[in-house]
Amino acid sequence: MIKLKHHPKYDTIVNWGKLISLTGSAQVIVQAVGFVSGILIIRLLSVQEYAFYTLANTMLGAMTVLSDGGISTGVLAQGGKVWKDKKELGKVLVTGLEMRKKFAIASLIVSLPILLYLLLHNGAGWLTAGLIILSIIPAFYATLSDSLLEIPLKLNQSIVPLQKNQIAVSLGRLLMVASTIFIFPFAYLSILTSGIARIWGNIHLKKYANEFADTTEVEDKEVKKEISLIVKRSLPGLIYYCFSGQISTWIISIFGNPASIAQIGALGRISSVITLLMVVFSILIVPRFARMQNQPQKLLRHYSKILFFISIILLFILTCTYLFSDQILWVLGNNYKKLNAELVLLMTATSITTIMAAALSLYLSRGWIMQYYITISASLLPIVISCFLFDISTLRGILYLNILVASVQMILHVSYGYYKILKLNKNIEESLNT
């Protein structure tokens, strides 16, 4: 034990152990509470109502990506440069918040008519569709600021207040869902409870953010210019990804039926265990990677280690899913109990996508942006091929499509991260030689 304490890596390992246990335990609570809320919704909503709920949440995700447009990436990249200066970090945060409000208007104008069409196309009445659209607005409003307000805390590794806020929001949502869904099992109420809980959480999150970033600062033109450059490079690809990322739901909503929409939504709830991994990753790993100096060998070593360990964890999760698929499906209820093969396929696609997302998050945190025409081309090609290979009107066919698209995207983004790090090394060597 004494020898271990004198080991040069001892303090680092202990500190990481404390951080991971703290973050992991809090996220287990957050995800467990969220999982219970989700299961209540799955079990108590009718198949058709849950199909509407899935469509609305899918569109909410697309709206969130559109309203961000790469702004949060820009704020993280710029904030990583000035994270020790409260005033400068405040300027970065305020600039990002102001930019996002403007993007939100365009997002609403584009997304809500599409959602209205999909709801009506899948059997919703005008009243139901209208109520669902109205219920999305509070949830969307909350997403405009929460991801940005978290950045000062993440950069300063102030984990405890962030975790407390997430737990409080999850418990608040569960309380509201449990108190309404037994009496009023409607999709729009389930969506509304999530939005109200998040708005309450953001009020408190802003107080925590103020400790590290002065939110009374005004928008900074130079910071806006730097963030805008990232947005300009990111936006075309993000516009495409906000729809291609949920391509399975979009295709089924057009060519399939409400039952298939509900099935893919219910199976997606199981992937919350992987969401736990990504939340811990975004809180602990990405900000630290963003703060690293431009030392190619160090970046290369950490980039490789991170992706390797994530892959091992995902392989373990996928194996458990295969072995215990009957028990997992029992949790979802009788409407979804025969989807064993589909569950494994979905978790396979989700695992591959998670590796891709990890690589993407890491290199974006450095301010590296891939040309959008490359990412779009690399995604469109497997989608087109899949339409000829698989029956995309069925759930299983859509899941095969997901796996093929995710695999191509994973290879692309992991490779791009390595390319940028190796290019950085080459540039440094050239500058030293000159």
What are these regions (language model features)?
Residues M1-V33, K87, V94, L205, ...:
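N-terminal membrane topogenesis motif
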Residues T12, W16, Y117-S135, P258, ...:
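Interfacial segments at transmembrane-helix termini and the short loops linking adjacent helices
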Residues I13-T73, R233-A259, A406:
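Signature of the first transmembrane helix
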Residues N15-V30, A56, V65, G69-L116, ...:
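Membrane-water interface segments that mark the loop-to-transmembrane alpha-helix transition
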Residues D68-K84, K154-L155, A213-D214, S271-P296, ...:
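Helix-loop junctions and terminal segments of transmembrane helices
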Residues T128-L134, P138, Q163-E211, G268, ...:
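Hydrophobic alpha-helical transmembrane segments
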Residues F140-K164, T348-T375:
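Membrane-interface junctions at transmembrane-helix termini in multi-pass inner-membrane proteins
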